[in-house]
């Protein structure tokens, strides 16, 4: 996923396909629903010649046209990340406000909050580190793992604009503090759990 401070459903769209009559196009449901992305449905119901069920996006062009294809012989579910997660969040947020009858300007912008005479923080939401760690350890969750890496970097540097490398530097410093040699470990990113381990039991 494209990590940003504004994430809606982890920047991912879940597409569920339901079969119809044999040879017909399957019915699709997308969560979260939004006009930020478009949907192309070329699925076929109970038609093995259509190939395996697949959900994809025109990622080479940084587009958000989701294409769902292949054979649907039963309920099928797939996920795809959306380009520019912050814009996905804002676009869908304003769309939901308008659906509730709340008037909004067609344009939007976002930046760091600067408290002044015309700006007031209306709400603040925080997730505990323990809750994030629990999620990371439960299943391979790259988004939360990358977010945790960035959080480590922010705590390590004290800065507001941080990168994955800042988080890796914090981990290397901890390894050294524990009496080990950081260069002996392959620290690549904040990726979630893996079927193979780069780090030894020490």
Language model features: what each stretch is:
Residues 1-183:
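Conserved serine DD-peptidase/penicillin-binding transpeptidase domain
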């Amino acid at each position: 996923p494209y990590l940003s401070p504004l994430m809606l459903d982890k920047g991912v769209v879940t597409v569920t396909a339901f079969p119809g009559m044999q040879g017909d196009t399957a019915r699709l449901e997308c969560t979260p629903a939004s006009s930020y992305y478009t949907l192309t449905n070329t699925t076929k119901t109970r038609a093995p010649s259509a190939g395996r069920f697949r959900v994809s996006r025109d990622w080479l062009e940084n587009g958000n046209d989701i294409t769902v294809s292949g054979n649907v012989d039963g309920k099928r579910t797939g996920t795809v990340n959306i380009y520019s997660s912050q814009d996905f969040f804002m676009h869908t947020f304003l769309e939901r406000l308008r659906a509730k009858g709340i008037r909004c300007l067609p344009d939007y912008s976002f930046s760091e909050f600067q408290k002044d005479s015309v700006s007031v923080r209306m709400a603040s939401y925080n997730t505990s580190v323990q809750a994030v760690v629990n999620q990371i350890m439960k299943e391979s969750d790259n988004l939360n793992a990358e977010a945790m890496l960035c959080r480590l970097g922010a705590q390590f540097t004290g800065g507001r604009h941080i990168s994955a490398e800042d988080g890796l530097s914090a981990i290397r410093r901890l390894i050294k503090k524990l009496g080990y040699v950081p260069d002996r470990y392959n620290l690549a990113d904040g990726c979630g759990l893996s079927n193979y381990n780069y780090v030894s039991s020490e």
